[in-house]
């Protein structure tokens, strides 16, 4: 686990303030819009997961709501547990495809079946 520096809050406020000035207050995944009153729920995600990589142009930052940020980091936890590969910004379920089986496909016939 990474060691959190003592001045982390100061570092975070620096890049957070910059990111909020650069990007619109919208979650990069779910497109939820934010206003000043709920801005604390909008977080800055480091795309490469390196919190020391803070370029002035914001190219390593992405604004995510709390829920999407948790989801993004949970993919890496699952990858560590199950040995899968995760590409930053991509959904782990992307290649799985849609479900093929429909349990209700023949429901009407099953309900009309006489005993």
Curated annotation (Swiss-Prot):
Going by the UniProt record, its keywords in alphabetical order are: Hydrolase, Nuclease
Q: Name one GO cellular component term.
A: cytosol
Disulfides per UniProt: none
What CDD domains does the record tag this protein with? HNHc
EC number(s) recorded for this UniProt protein: 3.1.-.-
GO molecular function terms here? endonuclease activity; nucleic acid binding; zinc ion binding
InterPro entries (UniProt xref): HNH, HNH_nuc
Q: Which domain of life is it from?
A: Bacteria
User: A Pfam family for this UniProt protein?
Assistant: HNH
Q: What class of enzyme is it?
A: hydrolase
> Does the keyword field hold Endoplasmic reticulum?
no
List each copy of the HNH domain by range. Answer: 27-75
Say which family it is in. Answer: Belongs to the HNH nuclease family.
Q: Can you name this protein?
A: Putative HNH nuclease YajD
The organism named in the record is Escherichia coli (strain K12)
């Amino acid at each position: 686990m990474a060691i959190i520096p003592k001045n982390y809050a100061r570092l975070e406020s620096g890049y957070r303030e910059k990111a909020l000035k650069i990007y619109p207050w919208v979650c990069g995944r779910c497109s939820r819009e934010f206003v000043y009153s709920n801005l604390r729920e909008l977080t800055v995600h480091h795309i490469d997961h390196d919190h020391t990589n803070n370029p002035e142009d914001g190219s390593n930052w992405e604004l995510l709501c709390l829920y999407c940020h948790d989801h993004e980091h949970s993919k890496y936890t699952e990858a560590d547990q199950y040995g899968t590969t995760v590409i930053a910004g991509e959904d782990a379920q992307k290649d799985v495809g849609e479900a093929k089986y429909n349990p209700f496909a023949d429901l009407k016939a099953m309900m009309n079946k006489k005993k």
